[in-house]
Amino acid sequence: MYDMVVTLTGLDMARMKNGQMTRATAGYAYVGGACVRNSRLSKISSVALVEDSGAYSGVVVTAHEIGHLLGAVHDGDTAPSYLSRSPGAKTCPWSDGYMMSDFRRTSRGLRWSDCSTRQMKYFLRTSTASCLYNTPHSSSHPLAGPSVLAGAGLSLNAQCQADRGTNACYHDQRVCVQLFCYYKKTGSCYATRPAAEGSTCGRGKHCLSRKCVIRSRHYGKGNT
């Protein structure tokens, strides 16, 4: 069995809100769902679903949903009733733009707010989270990590093509914070996420943690 599982889908996710279907959904997870299995209700809550275009558009959303599974609500919200002793996130404004917000327009979008950190620390001390501390089964075929960063193998245009079927509007340091793609319907540029880690952001530079830095010799060359 697993502690948490995240499923990535290339399908366009949607949900019902106030009786209307909205497609403005990129991920879903249960708050405090890690390790939770209710055999009486045949329900498993330790799951998350994330939409990904195939060009790493779901990476940040995956981290956001894992935050939910580890007990963090959206910044600005109160804790759910079943986590009544959790500090919640009422004192951390949504507009600050940390990981548990979708207002992620600065480098803070890859960091947890103080509220998120406190909530996850609280959850990890509960008995619910006990499965996260057991010794995992060893595998005779462990998965090997990639030798290059994700963006090193995908140009900025390719990332926008996967997301919106158009090209990137900019090819400079701005893409590390927000990847702007051309939006045919309005004739303007639109961004929903940063370029993938390792994406080229200038001559001899690439994106790392939402910053445009000189490319390290430890990483492969990226594409523009």
Residue ranges and their predicted role:
Residues 1-224:
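Extracellular (secreted or membrane-anchored) zinc-dependent metallopeptidases
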